[in-house]
A protein has these predicted regions:
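Enzymes that bind and transform nitrogen-containing heteroaromatic metabolites
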Residues: 1-178
Length: 178
């Protein structure tokens, strides 16, 4: 299992945590959200993220909270990570190579993609099969768009293939129409 979740009975908060991830990054979610995240995370064998997210999170304290090897797409390897290890692999040759490396690491399991720019690059390269969005009722007013400008927009989605109502969040899953 990529991440474990412990759920309380009823609708009270549950704790979603990773056995080897950073315990400071434990999140409290509803039982429904914890179950949704557990099911989704069980499918994953590796992650692909961009350098901006890697830097913003300070490398998640050394290990992604989902306890998966994380492939980081970057133009330049960080100075403090001269070698790849079980936690992070750095790819400087583009999104296709990063996803191929993540598929190799995932060993038959799904590859998760996180970060709007990386998701957009995957859309543009035709690499996404599903999209999972966590809809939270908050308008931020500014910031980085979730996906930016997709080259072959509009991208049509089938579904939803999953809908989970958590507390203050709706988890939605769609298949990418190819």
């Amino acid at each position: 299992m990529a991440a474990s979740s412990t759920c309380s009975s009823g609708t009270g908060p549950a704790t979603s945590r990773s056995p080897r991830g950073n315990p400071d990054l434990t999140v409290k979610v509803s039982a429904a959200s914890a179950e949704h995240l557990r099911r989704l995370n069980e499918r994953l064998g590796a992650l692909v993220v961009g350098r901006r997210l890697y830097d913003m999170t300070n490398a998640w304290g050394g290990r992604h909270p989902l306890d998966l090897t994380t492939v980081v797409v970057t133009h330049q390897r960080p100075d403090d990570r001269p070698e790849d290890d079980e936690n992070f692999v750095f790819v400087t040759t583009g999104i296709e190579d990063a996803v191929a490396k993540a598929r190799e690491i995932a060993d038959g399991k799904d590859v998760g993609v996180n970060g709007g720019e990386i998701a957009r690059q995957c859309f543009d390269a035709g690499l996404l099969d599903e999209v999972h969005v966590d809809l939270v009722p908050v308008f931020l007013g500014s910031g980085i768009p979730l996906l930016g400008m997709i080259e072959d927009a509009p991208v049509e989605l089938d579904g939803p293939i999953s809908v989970t109502q958590g507390k203050g969040v709706t988890h939605l899953g769609y298949r990418v129409r190819k």
